[in-house]
Amino acid sequence: MCIRDRSKGISRLTMVVEGDDETLQQMTKQLNKLFNVLGVVDFTNLAAVERELMLLKVSSKEDTRSNILDIVQIFRAKVVDVSDMALTLEVVGDPGKLVALEKLLEPYGILEIARTGKVALKRSSGVNTEMLKINNYSLEI
């Protein structure tokens, strides 16, 4: 996903790739060789905020609408369009959250799905919440 950074007059591109350390190092080297690339940041071991957006259109008849809206509320999703036969939802979160919502809504009939893929920014606080989850710590602010 490519997003223009208004403050610097540059664009930011987020890529999610899988591979061993050698493959990722080679990819980083190749990207850094490109003329218009100012830098490459590997977020693998950094404290970062990661999110993904999903738009989902689900069949919603009168007798199922309240059940669907209950699920939507639990996932903190937003209803962005309504018709007699369908609801269009917007949900933001980690991929696990999006997949869980999709699975719960499948029985109602998913008509369309669009997903952005991950976007990420380094955490200013430096706190790696993923490591807190792994170590079963809770963070209270």
Describe the role of every protein-language-model region:
Residues 9-18, 86-91:
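A generic structural motif
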Residues 35-47, 77-84, 109-123:
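Conserved short beta-strand edge segments in small beta-sheet-based binding/regulatory domains
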